């Protein structure tokens, strides 16, 4: 999905850092709300549910570099833009599937 690799960092930098949303609101808009729209039982942490978690470093600024994207989609208008909120680890069903 084009833009997925930059969506959290851009959302954090442009919305949370600038006071438009709280971090909790951003997380809800990127997890709970899409799960509701898709009708899937995901988007929250609870006993007995799949542990699908993204861990991001919201303190460190980094430069978006599309040549380092994991996905095949390398097209982005944000190549070279600085942002905060680099995803460090992604866990799906309790298993680490991505580690920076």
Walk through the language-model features, giving the residues of each:
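C-terminal cap of metal-dependent C-N hydrolases
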Residues: 50-99
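His/Asp/Glu-enriched, well-ordered alpha-helical/loop segment
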Residues: 1-58
